[in-house]
Amino acid sequence: MTESHEDGEGELLSRIRELTGAALPIVVSLDLHANITERMVSHASAFCIFRTYPHIDMAATGARCFPILQRLLSGEILYPAMRQASFLVPLSAQYTGASPCKELYQLLPQDSAAGQAHCDIAMGFPPADIYDAGPAVVAYAASQAEADEHAQRIIEAMETKETAFDSALLSADSAVAKAMSHTGSKPVIIADVQDNPGAGATSDTTGLLKALVDGKATDAVLALLHDPQTVAAAQELGEGGIFDAALGGKSGLPDMGSYQARCRVLALSDGEFAFSGAMYAGATAQIGPTALLEIVDSESSVSVLVGSKRCQCLDRAILTHIGIDPGEKKIVAVKSTVHFRDDFEPIADLI
């Protein structure tokens, strides 16, 4: 969606078709969270959609587009079918590494060779809150009947799993208490799913930070809190400096004030580093000046990484670049919904 169009992709494809005519094949790669509309399907020759969340198959999805485009250019006709689910799936329940999404994606044909049906699933993006928000299945085949059969088969399988999409979330206090009671040797990861900037959140709410301090969490770190003003104050003081900070809560959201705390500046960074996880491996991050702060004058042991730009904490390098080894922490709190799993799950006992 855009500020002026509820169906931005449909509008874009419609304008392209006006220029190219109906004969030109157009194969489109889409995000797993796409909200697919009939208008989009009517103007595109085919869709290829990410099949992993975390999205570690972005390049592979582009590669899957090519053989389908070749088929269309060779003269093969692919008939489209689309089915929409009757329910919404929260982003936190769209993880493809576990049931029920794992089983649904196993239903998709893996071969895009000539003559083979092509199917994909989009899980939708509920926060968009548009008419067509929600999961959908697209299928393309040599006949309309075959395309309809594939789309119907997959959407019916999805409908049977509606109650399996777990939307239950812990309160911040409960999550901290559970993490503190854990006795394993590896960290507990707490995902602050309601404040994920990758889904449009402000990344500056402080409820989880307060819960960590009030819950007397030990050896805990939270990342990444968006607060340019606090970063600037820390940069001016320098490492080792102590100051009274009003952390986060500056986005203007109702009932989302700053967290007042006395902080020590542990480390500073220009925020430029290389991502190391599979999702963005090799890409250079430029998240602006950052400051690692320690909450002092409390019975807890909590540090918080504060940034001057919003960045979903989906890669361990966000922490390691400033000297924090998340694998050595007891609790790692991340402002992310699912993307963090690819890089953080291997070091964790519990999420």
Give residue spans per PLM region.
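Active-site histidine-anchored catalytic micro-motif
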Residues: 1-73, 187, 192-209, 213, ...
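Short acidic, glycine/serine/threonine-rich loops at helix termini
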Residues: 4-7, 37-42, 59-61, 92-99, ...
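Short alpha-helical segments and helix-capping/turn motifs at coil-helix boundaries
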Residues: 11, 207, 288-289, 315-320
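Short, structured patches in soluble enzyme cores that scaffold and shape functional sites
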Residues: 30, 51-52, 84-89, 139-141, ...
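C-terminal functional extensions of proteins
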Residues: 66, 73, 78, 345, ...
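Internal, active-site/partner-interface "lid" segment
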Residues: 73-101
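Hard-cation-handling environments
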Residues: 92-301, 305-309
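Catalytic centers of hydrolytic enzymes
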Residues: 298-351
